[in-house]
């Protein structure tokens, strides 16, 4: 059995990283951490937030700076593993499952830096990074033979749709970047509060 895990929001808690960078780039922002994430978890993007709350009609300079800074070590060091994930990955490996990391990160160095930092580097059979150039499906298809017994686990609608396109089971977790109500619209095979609640059969 193959299990494909998304990284940000699914295995690691990146909420603080995104919020702190937003506050840095928009210093006039008085949005609290919870206010910012209430918006984001309801699928309200930065372009809409900038226009509605700050009167910024051209979001391109913001987006450019965001992409430049979001994967720097300064901000990556704000990330932390979701509770119990290390033990969970050990549990899955002991079941002789094939685990893959599939992420939309731009830069491999930040991914490997965090995997080494968290002690996860040897848990995965392969680490697939789209570099914001390819879809997750594009990376998985030519490299790994999948079947209907396999899973993809993520916290976004895109992850669920990837599973459907690959004809594998899609598992959503609701403690990441989208709310349970938003995730339900994509009709995953199951939704869990956190990744460690998922136990593949």
Please provide the spans of the model-predicted regions.
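N-terminal helical cap/lid subdomain that shapes the substrate entry/recognition surface
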Residues: 2-87
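Asp-based, Mg2+/Mn2+-dependent phosphohydrolase catalytic module
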Residues: 1, 112-201
